[in-house]
Amino acid sequence: MSVLLIAKTLGLFFITAIAEIIGCYLPYLWLKKDGSAWLLIPAAISLAVFAWLLTLHPAESGRVYAAYGGVYVVTALLWLKAVEGASLSTYDAVGAAFTLTGMAIIAVGWNH
């Protein structure tokens, strides 16, 4: 994979993860934090965008989902810190590094 393709793939995975997290976080706010049921409308839209974004990758869907998982984990941890204000631990960092390593191994194999 070229450096440009890797950057595009990681960027698309990151945007995809944000769409998925928003699509799941809004119902969480409704169910657990007394948010408005109206939050379900943007949540549904966000999840539809998430599904569409996953179709934009040039590999079989199973490989895309597996590789995407690594970026999702890192994005979810960043969300945890930025949006929910939680502190990240060394375990979070080590786990994120392992998942990104797995993602990289899978993504490199797309062309083989």
From Swiss-Prot:
Coiled coil: none annotated. It holds the Pfam family UPF0060. It is a multi-pass membrane protein. Keywords: Cell inner membrane, Cell membrane, Membrane, Transmembrane, Transmembrane helix. The chain crosses the membrane at residues 10-30, 36-56, 64-84, 90-110. Its main location: membrane. It comes from the Bacteria. It is found in: Cell inner membrane. GO terms for cellular component: plasma membrane. The keyword Cell membrane applies. InterPro entries: UPF0060 (IPR003844). Belongs to the UPF0060 family. This is UPF0060 membrane protein IL2332.
